């Protein structure tokens, strides 16, 4: 747990046609030979990822992609992988050369605008317009714009400028314009990456006690806590809260030994029923998964989606998504427990399908409900992209913790720490 989780880093995607210098831009940004560079079109096949520190922004993850204009059977598969990357990036870099834009770049821009993803335009290979660029980044940008204008004419440059985004001129070969590109990245990354987003620390005051319930089951990793637990502990400590950690079997004794009741109890969703019975009704209770429904997704939308459980009919298909890939053993939460609890609650004969990692079915209209994990291993943008797709397909979406709480009859209590979500629930059920 020494490194910052990948899901917490700003994801910056590098897109464009083949042979415009996308991989060279990545190598220049990171000052490493991360991606293979070749004159052969289509050198980059699978997305290439590289983390680096970009101050004052902090840790970022660059993703180099295959050319959006790739051809042939394999080429089309590479394009599909590139499109999947679009779903999880927080900022896009569109790389073109001095020949300007065509339908491929316009397609990318349309995708980014639909997702409200900020983007930067990079005009690369300026060295081919003048082999000995003037020194100084400011001079280089001014002179490069003049050379491109001379080459393309007013119309083509106006086409780039009409998008009202930052345009950066670069020569990845000569490492020119790269500092300007870094500054443009820092300027355009969503503001949320410059501030701390709370997981649980806004739910209690500094100095108050939070009790975290962490079952140790067969799927628990050896020698450490799982990522959502670690992140929640750190978030609470940052707020000067007092954190106590216990297993579900020792919870009642832990509470009895406290002189002052805790302000909040947070449990693994799988232990919801026992923990709810052991925690007095005057103490607020929720789960790690519900905290992450807010942290990585949209809690209010997930609350609405959870209520769709009431409308399930026999034969309905339910999609269960997990951000990570793991070997399921025993009573796996996604493959065994959640299907069992929903089936018991509804009394219906339902079909369950599972997807893991970045895979997401292209046609989700076939599903009556989507249930997502807490998404601790992916970034928020990818979850928001999936929420958008679910809305467009008119398919309700929720997550593990909310589904479990609803199926076990403790949904209302689990929402009490979140005033806005609880208000939505009350309005929808009155």
Which residues does each predicted region cover?
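Short, charged N-terminal beta->alpha structural module
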Residues: 24, 28, 212, 219-235, ...
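Canonical P-loop GTPase G-domain recognition
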Residues: 118-120, 125-133, 139-198, 202, ...
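G-domain G4 guanine-recognition motif of GTPases
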Residues: 65, 96-99, 120-131, 168-176, ...
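An anion/phosphate-binding loop that grips the pyrophosphate of nucleotide cofactors and donors
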Residues: 89, 262, 367
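Conserved Switch II/interswitch segment of TRAFAC-class P-loop GTPases
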Residues: 70, 86-107, 116-130
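C-terminal functional extensions of proteins
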Residues: 314, 337, 345, 362, ...
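Conserved G1/Walker A P-loop phosphate-binding module
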Residues: 1-76, 84-85
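Redox- and metal-dependent alpha/beta enzyme cores, enriched for Fe-S-associated oxidoreductases
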Residues: 294-347, 353-359, 364
